[in-house]
Amino acid sequence: MNICGPQRYDKENNTCFNVDQLVEMAKAYNRYLSKTKLNPSRNYHFGDADLINIKSDKKYLLKQFKDRFGKICGSDEICLTHQAFMGELVGEMKDDILFGTFRSEGPSKSTEWLSTIDINQIMVPYENIYPNFKFIGAVPADCDQVSVCPLYNINYDKLMDEGINYIATIFNHDRYGQPGSHWVAMFVDINNGKLYYCDSNGKEPTKYIENSIEKFAQFYKRKTGNDIIYKYNKNSYQKDGSECGVYSCNFIIRMLSGEPFDNIVSNSLSFQEINSCRNVYFRNQPSKFKPHKLCDPTNSGK
């Protein structure tokens, strides 16, 4: 069920929702329905207009929503989140349901270049799977020099205090304000002083990206007295002009799964294999190729 966000699919119940989400959605439905009864002149469409008995039973709650919205949404759970009662949800639970439960809608064309938004929507949900991981973002090469950029004055001590051990950044070779040219990835193990850089064209980082690498090296030297362990990919395996963003996301996802850096860069995915990952990362599944198991190793087959 590839519309679900990473590790969100419940195969037994064929749903992307967890029971806590369904409980809050049922409460929101009841609040909305109660307001309707107080304002009968307003135009609402509910189907079965009975309140839902609230209990932590996933099968039961799924059936309640199917009974009420089956004619409108069928089995489309995204459709359910577009119903008016969802406006009664607030805070983190609403954000989790709307932005964390499902894969995002990606580019419609199978070889369309990934935007900053596309990349962020792929990567941010992995923070929920790995609580000690933070995705810094898809950023320009000179991000560390731009005050509105997340790498500007980045505080590694604070990240460690917050329980963050791993961070990742996807850089564009262009600087802030430029249109964008090529995506590359950086993965950092803060506690152990390890930094891995991966350009699918097999090149060293540009001087602007080197600034960010050097800042981490200086931090780790001050903190531990040791030099960082730094590796970069020397193998050129991208054979097209469209998949650099997908390669960059895939590199980080595989690093998070525990796959060794050397294995990732020496066993790279072909164009067909990396393009197939779009069918895992985006719910509209634009690629004509069957998803490769290494698109998301920890979520393979789910």
UniProtKB/Swiss-Prot annotation:
GO terms for cellular component: virion component. It comes from the Viruses. It is found in: Virion. GO terms for biological process: proteolysis; viral protein processing. SUPFAM superfamilies: Cysteine proteinases (SSF54001). GO terms for molecular function: cysteine-type endopeptidase activity. It is an enzyme of class 3 (hydrolase). Its EC number is 3.4.22.-. Transmembrane segments: none annotated. The keyword Membrane does not apply. Its main location: virion. Keywords: Hydrolase, Protease, Thiol protease, Virion. The active site is at 182, 199, 244 (nucleophile). Belongs to the peptidase C48 family. This is Putative thiol protease R355.
